Amino acid sequence: MEFAQQRDAVIVEDFFDQIYHDLTPFWGLQPAKIRRQAKNFDFVISIRNGSTTVKSDDTDRPWMALWNNLTATVAEWLPDIDIPINVMDESRVVVPWEDINEYVKVERATRKLVAQPEVVTEYSGLRELDEDPGEPFDPEWIKDGLYWDIARVGCSPDSPSRDIEALTNFSGPPPMPSGFPARSFKGYVANWTEAKDPCLQPDLRGSHGTFVEPISLSTTHYLFPLFGGSKLPLNNEILLPPAMYWTTDEFYSGGEEHGGAWETKNTGVIWRGVASGGRNKLENWTRFQRHRFVSMVNGTAVQLAEKNSNGVGPNFELLSYNTYHLTATQYMDLGTWLNGISEAAFVNLVCFPETGNEHCPYTDSYFEVKKVMRMRKQYAYKFLPDIDGNSFSGRYRGFLRSTSLPIKATIYSEWHDSRLIPWLHFVPMDNSFVDIYGILDYFVGTGIAEQQGGEEKPSVQGAHDEQAKKIADAGKEWAEQVLRREDMQIYVMRLLLEYARVCDEKRERLGFIDDLR
């Protein structure tokens, strides 16, 4: 607590719920087993006597270096521990729901309030483990198959996705809502937790690259401690603040220039990125989320779909104008409107197999490749959509800290989720993206300023610019209080103290009671 007070931290107990969600199942494993699993993993950050060391391969692993740097800043206050690290983009641990349920039952049965005289306040240490690390363990990595079928065992038996098999044909547009997205309120995200959960949305198996064809596949159904920067809600990794949030590299952080005043910004959408999300190929690229989003906010692509294909594009399908009742489409067609307010493009089409350049023979005719735009230049626009890549998007924290408004769609969980409130700190978006038009219509309106009778200055029909600014300002102000580097340090310190407790033979009696003495 002293560490947090010295850094002027906002401490709300709910901010740390993710720690206990992640660690609870490990009470179902013997501490000695957890310690040996952690010690013998291939990629490990170890703390001994307040200093950190890294075990890795010879490959350059920038994430390992960044996480080690973060851990080292708080290591002097931590006990000896081994922290296994997931160096891949993709989540790697998904334990069957039934197994996790049994592990949680053990935690509930064994954790009790302990009388003060019985509390142990010192960790046991790892001297015996260092002297005898034991044999390497085999997580039994699954490296073949369809990830949807591998992952859905992590869904509860009564969830919509549990018994739905993976798709094998990914030609044509993905499954799209025929009306308002499920679990929405009048077409807009009402429950952010549900909106991100693949267990509740079987259609994601055919519309998100994670389930179509991830970049790499190395997953286990075996519970062991593995730390990473993001995970699906059904995965069992232990979340750290992502390494890209700790870096000062302006490519991800946007630097300390967070954009100018709202009134000086371009009233429109900007998005730049690579065509990541998995291995997009000739036979499946139409099912990838970034390709779909770029197409759906491209005025020309939308005009072609409207005029030539009854609203159906190669990788999306438009809803009827009568669904969201947009103000803009009362004055012009959807494509024309988008041409005036949206600017989204890839900087690399990332072919599989690779072409050796930024182009791709099977998507070149659909997408224009543009130059990289640094985040500081993107901050000149009011609206910043953020879309999953191979996993989470590393730009989200930078967007939240900017004076622009983040519009977020994701299926990934991060360390800070309980700190951020949708519609207060950011605008949530459904992973089908069918609500993007309604979102922009509400905030931007027609995009055309006209002088109305009795008004001092031109106004935009249907626009709610002040409401957009209010959310952007609230998100920035809150991020500057709870998403600082200091807040990441505090989270990691508490996480690793609790993790060390789970690894300790005396864990049921281990506790902090100095405040009671």
State where each predicted segment sits.
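Secretory-pathway glycan-assembly enzymes, especially type II membrane glycosyltransferases
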Residues: M1-R374, R509-L516
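Catalytic binding pocket for nucleotide-activated donors in carbohydrate/polymer assembly enzymes
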Residues: V372-L516
